[in-house]
Every structure is written in C-alpha cells, then in structure tokens.
Design a protein with these regions (language model features):
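Glycoside hydrolase catalytic-domain context in secreted enzymes
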Residues: 1-6, 13-22, 26-28, 49-464
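Short beta-strand elements
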Residues: 29-53
Length: 464
C-alpha cells in the first residue's frame, strides 16, 4: 500500500494513519473489514527495503519527465489550469535533442573498456546445460559452463534470436522455438496456429485469477504440443489511452489487475514448461517505433511498471520482450536503469531479455552493442545484418557482455520442457527423435527405390 514519493523521500513511503481494508460483494456492499493503524511514516529506503524487493527503489527516471508541467494534487489541484492548458508552442530542450542525435548516430565503441580482461572461451570442462537444470542463478558451475562457449556460438545466439534460441554444441544446448502471441499461438514460418482465445481485456474483465491461470495452462499445453518452449506473451502494458493500437493485447488500465492476471498466466504456462516473454517492456505506446513516452517517476512505478513487477515477483516470469518505445529520449533497450537497476536489481528478475522485432537493421534505432551493454540479451531478428551483430566480438568487453547474455538465455531455457524428464539427458524430445527416425526410414526407402529403378533401366537398355 506504500506510495512512491518522487520529490522528497525519493522512495516508497507508507504514511502514518488508519488503513481500512474491506472485503466487498460489490462496490457498495461491505462484507467484512479491518482497520490497521500505522503509527509513523515508514520510508522504504537504503537497507529498509520492501519485503518484495531485492534492493530499495529510488529515483532513476528523472530524464523521462521532459519539459512539461505535471498535474499535482497539492492544494486541491492548484496547478490544474497550467498543467492542462494547450501550449501555444513547444520546444524540446537541448539535452534531449543531443541524446536523440546520439541515438541516431550511435558509436559502437561507446561501451568498450580496454581495461576489461578477456574471459576463457572454448574450454573443455565436461559440463552440459542439462547439468544446470534447477541450479541457482549464482551457482559457481555456471562460470565453468560459460568458459566452454565459443565466441562464434555466443555471437550467433545473440544476433539470430527471432522466434528461437540457437543451439550451442559446446554445452549441449538444443535449439528451442518461440511462438507469438497473446490470444493464439502462431508459427510465423509454417503457418500453423492454435485455436483463438478471448483477448486479454476480456480475461481481465472476469477478475478471476484462477481463470487467468487456466488460460496460461492452455497456452502452455498448446505451445508444447506445437513444439515451442517460449511464448511471446502475455502483453502487460497499461491502457494509457483509448486509442492505443494494441490495447487488445493488454489487460487493463489498472496495473494491479493486469499484474495479477499476467502473473497467473505466466504461472499457468510454466506448469507445461513454457517460459513467457512478458511484453512490451515498458510504457509501450501503440504500434509505432521511436515514440517517446514522457512521464514522472511516481506514475512510471505505480502505474506503468506495476503489471510487469507483479508478474516477475509473483508469477516468476523469467523472460521479457523489450518495447520499441523511447523512455524520454532513450530507447528502452538502451536504458540500463530500466533493464538492470529496476528489473534485475530491484525486482530480482533472473532470465533473458529479448528485443521486439528487429529485422536486420534495428529500424534505425536498435543495435546489439547498445542492447547488450544495458541489459538486453538477444535480438528478435530472422535476417542477418550489421545492427543485430556485435560490432567488436573479439574485444574483452563484448565477450564479457555476450557471455552474460548467453547465461541469461540458458538459465531461462534450461527451466523449460526441453530439459525435463524424457529429454533431460539428450536435450531432444521424443517427437523430434521419432521425426528423425521417420526421415531416416523414408530416405532409405527412397534410396532403395532409386537403386531398383536404375537397375531396371539398365536391364532394359541391355536387352535392347
């Protein structure tokens, strides 16, 4: 129940007072209620973090405020006229203009550090990814496993992650598949799809967490039957405006409702060994690229990040898809405060982060170097190009970043159905084994038929 105070404490604060908590049959009828008294203000700062956080939250999105006046409740909305008046003209401040220029002319050596030391690659430590099933993120064996990776394997994994994660022979990692989207599972390459479910708005309108979990279970089961380990869903953004182009993919304008629906859907899919890419992280504004979203720290945290936060903390989400949006003047995938400080450090997220659809050119504003340096792991690209590849793959900084990214991917993948039970040792599902067997039988049959045809032809030729 704490609110975020961005101006004074710059932290979550639970104000002193009497809090009435009630259970209602509807918005007017109270079935039961209790009053809880907080004797003094509680500031969740420094070592006194909220119980759900790994580290205490503090202001990190000051640059997203922009040069605007925000409506305030102070003195009964005293600044209402100023905050809501249409401006006669508007001019973007110089710091923002400069940042946009840097985004469009990104120097791919920006994040390289010549003091970094090259890590071990290509080692023979005798480990496979299957050995890390159920291992903690901080298990020291990860370092030994990562030492086995080659630079080429890591670079390929990162560059070509469109609807898949690539195989890595050095650690016995199998290739996995990811399918889209929130209301139905679709394979964009084969055209095979599942039945359609109601859109997320309808799911949220039930206010039924059990139903949301059952929906996630259905999606997980269908994904598994179609051979996919990853699901590009659920959509977790907030209905910021009624004209949002993809509102149908998102649950609600209420972050708590959306978060509870999403967390249960994620949990449901995970019961079938499917990891969910909660998307589009974060503050996605419709269906446009490079649209800047301006907001303040309190609104960002209490409204727009809330669904993602609940899905991570309560649903155990271990994959996210990053948005095309700019948070202020910076692409969300290049915003370390979003991808690292909040997502990983504050919320305790462990897993992989994927860009939105990348093509091969990053649409002019996304690139692998900026992404890796700021907490994004892989590019949703199905075409090989310059921007989805690391520019300096032999530099120690790049190798360290690629190594960390591959760890995040493998940590997520090894939790999937690709590594449970029947295929834990080989990393291969029975249906794939059967398919390979059938292919071999057909190939042998065709080869035999070819031999018979050739022999028959030669006999007829000799007889003539």
């Amino acid at each position: 129940m704490a609110s975020y105070d961005e101006n004074n404490a710059k932290a979550y604060v639970l104000e002193k007072g009497d809090y009435v908590i009630s259970i209602n049959s509807d918005s007017h009828t109270v079935l039961d209620q209790k009053t809880y008294t907080v004797d003094k203000d509680v500031v969740y700062k420094g070592e006194n973090k909220r119980s759900s956080d790994d580290t205490a939250a503090t202001n990190v999105f000051e640059d997203a405020k922009g040069d605007v006046t925000y409506l305030s409740r102070a003195d009964h909305f005293a600044n209402y006229e100023e905050a809501t008046a249409a401006p006669a003209s508007a001019e973007l401040g110089e710091p923002y203009v400069s940042e946009y220029h840097l985004n469009s002319n990104f120097d791919k050596t920006t994040y390289l550090n010549d003091e970094d030391v090259m890590p071990t690659t290509g080692a023979d430590n005798g480990l496979t990814l299957a050995d890390m099933r159920d291992a903690d993120y901080d298990d020291p064996r990860w370092e030994k496993l990562l030492d086995q990776l080659t630079v080429d394997e890591m670079a390929n994994m990162i560059a070509m992650a469109g609807y898949q994660t690539a195989a890595m022979d050095s650690v016995g990692k199998v290739a996995t598949l990811d399918f889209d989207g929130p209301a139905a599972i679709n394979n964009n390459f084969t055209g095979v799809g599942s039945i359609g479910f109601p859109i997320e708005v309808v799911v949220a309108s039930t206010w039924n967490k059990e139903l949301a979990q059952a929906w996630g279970e259905c999606m997980g089961k269908i994904s598994q039957e179609m051979g996919a380990e990853g699901w590009y869903a659920p959509g977790m953004n907030t209905h910021r405006t009624a004209f949002g182009a993809r509102n149908y993919e998102y649950f609600s304008e209420d972050g708590v409702l959306a978060g509870n629906m999403g967390a249960n859907a994620v949990e449901g899919a995970r019961r079938y060994g499917v990891y969910s890419y909660i998307k589009h992280f974060a503050l996605y504004e419709g269906n446009a690229k490079m649209v800047s979203v301006w907001s303040n720290e309190q609104a960002i945290r209490e409204i727009y990040l809330k669904p993602f936060e609940i899905s991570v903390k309560q649903g155990g989400a271990n994959a996210v898809m990053v948005s095309w949006s700019f948070l202020g003047d910076k692409w969300t995938g290049e915003c370390s405060n979003l991808m690292n400080t909040v997502l990983r450090e504050e919320w305790g997220f462990r897993g992989m982060a994927l860009t939105d659809f990348f093509r091969n050119n990053g649409h002019g504003f996304m690139n692998a170097d900026a992404a890796l340096a700021n907490g994004v792991d892989v590019m949703l690209s199905t075409f090989n190009g310059e921007e989805n590849n690391v520019a300096n793959p032999e530099h120690p900084t790049s190798v360290l970043q690629m190594r960390n990214a591959c760890k995040n991917v493998m940590y997520t993948v090894v939790s999937s159905w690709a590594y449970d039970g029947e295929h834990e040792e080989t990393g291969m599902e029975n249906w794939k084994k059967a398919g390979i067997g059938i292919d071999i039988v057909i190939a042998l049959f065709m080869a035999g038929m070819e031999v018979l045809v050739i022999r028959g032809y030669k006999k007829r030729k000799n007889a003539e």
